[in-house]
Amino acid sequence: MKKNTVALLALMLAFVMLFAVGCDTLPEDVDELVVYNWADYIYDYEDDFKEYYKNLTGRDIKVTYVTFDTNETMLTKILNGDSIVDVMCPSEYAIQKLLENGLLRELNYFGTAEEYIDTNSLNGYVHNSENIDSRFIEKIDEVFGSVQITDGDGTKTVRMADYFVPYMYGTLGVLYNKVYFEELGIYDRETLNNANWGLLFNDDGNGNLLSDGLTGRIYMKDSIRDSYAATVFYLLESGKLDGLTVQDTSSPNYGKPYTELTMGQMINTVDDQLIDLCADVLKKQKEQLYGYEVDFGKNELIQGIAYVDLAWSGDALYAVEESWDDDYIDPMLEYEEGESGGYTLGYYVPHDSGNIWFDGWVIPTTCPDEHLQAAKIFINFLNELYVSANNMMEIGYTSAVSAEKVRNDPECREILAQGYLVYGEDWEITDEDGNVLSQEDCDYASWEEFAEYFFDYVDPIDDSNWRYPFEIVPDNEYGREINQLGVMKDFGANNNKVSTMWEDVRSTGITAWALLGWTALALAVVVGVIALVLWLKRRKMMYVVVKKSSTEQHK
C-alpha cells in the first residue's frame, strides 16, 4: 500500500513537472531541454552532457529530466497534449503510434550531418550516426518499412527510420534458476531446447508436464504484449497452429497458414482465432503459475521462491550477475580441481521463435523551435562511444551503438574495465577507497578475458549471445538465425481485442498457488485476531485483579 502511494505521488509529481517546465525565466545565455525517459534508463549523464553542449554551443543548458513507468502512460500524455516535452524515449510500437498520429518531428539522423542539424552554428560538431549498428536500421526497414502518417499537411507515407534514433535493444526470453532446475533433473541442453517456450507453461515440448516441481513456481509478465508474444510462439512451436490460417480479412496475410509466416508476421498477427487460442492457453497456464509480476520476479528467482520467469534480456543480465555464488558449481561448465563459483540464474532464448525489441529517441512536434537544436544535440551525445559504454555498464541493457566500436575504443575499455574490475596495463583499477587493485584482486585478469564474457559470450544451453542477439554463432546446434526474432508493431485497431482478452485471463479465477497464499494469509490474520482478543481479555482480567488488590490495600 505504501509502495503504491509512493508510486502515485511520483507520477503526480512527474505530471506536475511536465506542466511546470518552461515557467521559470532563465538567463539569456542558458538554454533549456526537457527529457522524458524511463526511470533508471540512463547513467549519471548530466555533467557530461552540459560540458558536451557548452563545447559545441558556447552556452549553458538547464536539463529537466522527467520519467514515465509505461509506454501507455507516456502515450496518454502525448496523445492528449498534456505534456511539454522536447525529447523522449518510447518503445518501437509506441514510436509507430506517435508517428502515425503525426506527432513526431522528422530527424533524418542517418542522412548527412547538415540534413540533421545546423552544423555551421556549432563548434566542432561530429555526427555520430555511423556509430549505430547498421544491422539495426536494416531490421527496422524490414519490419516497419514505410508508415502512413496524418499530420497538418494531410496523409503521406514516410520511412520510420527517419523519425527516431535507436537507443537500447534486447530480447524476450526465460529467466530460470539453475540450482532448482538441476534438482528437478531438467537442467541440460536437450531438455531445455525441447521445451523452448514451453518452460513458461510447464510443457516439455511434447505436450507432457515438464516437471511436477515446476507447478506453482512459474512467473508470467503482467504485460499484455510480452505475454501475448510468448504465448503465440508457444502455440506455434507446440503444433497448436498446424492446419490453421490467418482469419483477419484486413491482413495482407489473410488465408495464409500461420506456420508459413515469418516471425515478424507471426508476432503481429492478432485475429480473433489467434486471440481465442491464446486466451485458452493462458487460462490453463494459471494452474502452473506462482503469479504475475512486472519488476520483482528476479528477486524471487534468486531466493528460490519461483524457478521460472518471462524476462527482458537487460533485466535478466542484471539478475544473472546478481546471482553469483562462490560455492555453486555449474554442471554445464568445466572447473579446475578445487575451483567453484557460478551464476545460479540463467537466461534462455528459445531458438525457434522470439522477439527482439528496441527503444529509441524521438522529438515530438510539441518541442518548441528554440529547444530543437538542444534536443538534437542530446540525441547525438547519447551516441558518443563513451556515453554508450557508461549506459550499458549502468543499466545493463544493450546499446544500439556498434559493439565493435565500443570494444576497440580506448576510453570505452577503461570505463568498462573500472566498472567490471578488469585488470590491464593501460589503466589502474581502484576500489571504493581509492586503493589500486592487483591483478589477483580484479574480477577479470585481462581485457581479453572480459571481452569474451561481455562481447562474445555464448550460452552453453541455447548457443545465443544474450547481450548481442545480432551475433549468431555460425555452428550453433539448433540453427538459430536473426530472422527468427520478430519485432512487434502497434496492434492498431485490434489493440482493444487483445487488451480485453488479457483482462479476461487475469480476472478468470486465480492461480492455485496464489489461492494457497491468500488462504494462508487469511488464516494468519484470523489466528492473529484470535490471539489479540485472548491477549486483551487476559490483560483486562489482570487489570481487574490488580485494581482489586490495590483497592483492598487501601481499605
Model regions and ranges:
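Mature extracytoplasmic/periplasmic domains
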Residues: 361-481
